[in-house]
Amino acid sequence: MKLNKENERIVLSGHEAIDILSEIEFILISLRNIARHYYTDASGEVSQKVRSAYCEETTQFIDKNNVTGRLSKVRGVISERFSHELGMENMDDIEREMEKMIYWEKPVDE
């Protein structure tokens, strides 16, 4: 990945870094705990009923705890540290890298 020279090193304050790590830790450990609660068999196999309960619990956790909002806030704190100078492709470094991402899309057969 080729970055604008200004973006080769970004700086966060200690408070910002702790806030970001706290958000990530809350989400990551909570999701792990939900999975461990429902997936108790070492093989990872569960009944459809348990899988449905796991999916419902995960969705409720995401919704009730504003996970998308929390992640958006983290993204904003990190993104604001970057220079948004446009490169030759008329995109900044973040846009150029995010363009490579493959995002979830609605399945074609629905």
Predicted feature residues:
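Exposed acidic/polar residues on beta-strands and adjacent loops within beta-sheet cores, strongest
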Residues: 4, 59, 108-109
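Low-complexity intrinsically disordered segments
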Residues: 86-110
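Acidic, low-complexity, intrinsically disordered interaction modules
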Residues: 39-94
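Amphipathic alpha-helices that form helix-helix packing interfaces
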Residues: 17-20, 24-27, 31-34, 67-70, ...
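N-terminal acidic leader/helix
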Residues: 2-41, 45-48, 52-53, 103-105
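N-terminal functional modules and adjacent low-complexity/disordered segments of proteins
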Residues: 7, 15-16, 56-57, 66, ...
